C-alpha cells in the first residue's frame, strides 16, 4: 500500500490517500466548509431559543419550557454523537461540566435534583427572576476547518425588568450528515471583574 499526500485547493493540511492515484483524486472537502454566515445564523438561533424558552417558562412553567428546551438541545447540540464539552456559566463543583443532554436540560430549565440548577434559560438569577427578552451575539473570532468551526465572543442578554448581562462564549460546531451545525463545544463564563 502506498501512502500519498494531496493538498486540495486552499486546504493547508495534507489529505492522505491509500492506494489509487493522486491524479484521480477528487476530494469534495471544500463543499463541506462551514461559512461565517452559518456560524452567525447558528448563534442567532441559539439566542432566539434562549428567549423562547424563557417566554415559555413565564407562560407555563416547566410544563412548557422543559419540552421546548429538550427540543432545542436535540436540534442544536451534538449529544447524539457522544459527549459534548459544555461548561455553563452558572455551575460549580462536581456538576460544572454537562457532557450529557440531561445535564444540559437541567442547566437550561432546572428541575433535576441530580444537578440542582435554577435554570439559566428561565431568566435572571435570584429569587425575583425576570425572563430574558433579548439576546444578541457579538462574535469576535470565527475559525473554520472544513466541517468544524469555532466561534468566540460575547452574548448580550436583557431581562424584562431591564437588567442586562454579558457572557463570554466559545462555541465549537460540527456539521452533521444533514448539513446542520451542531454544538459540540460550549464554554460560557462571566467576564472578569477586578477589585
Segments from the language model and where they lie:
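Surface-exposed, charged secondary-structure patches
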Residues: 87-158
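Conserved aromatic-histidine-acidic binding/catalytic patches
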Residues: 31-34, 38, 139, 143, ...
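Bacterial N-terminal signal peptides that target proteins for export
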Residues: 1-9
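Bacterial N-terminal signal peptides
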Residues: 10-17
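Short, low-complexity N-terminal intrinsically disordered segments enriched in polar/charged residues
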Residues: 23-79
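Short beta-strand edge/turn micro-motifs at domain boundaries
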Residues: 144-152, 156, 161-195
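Amphipathic alpha-helical coiled-coil segments
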Residues: 83-84
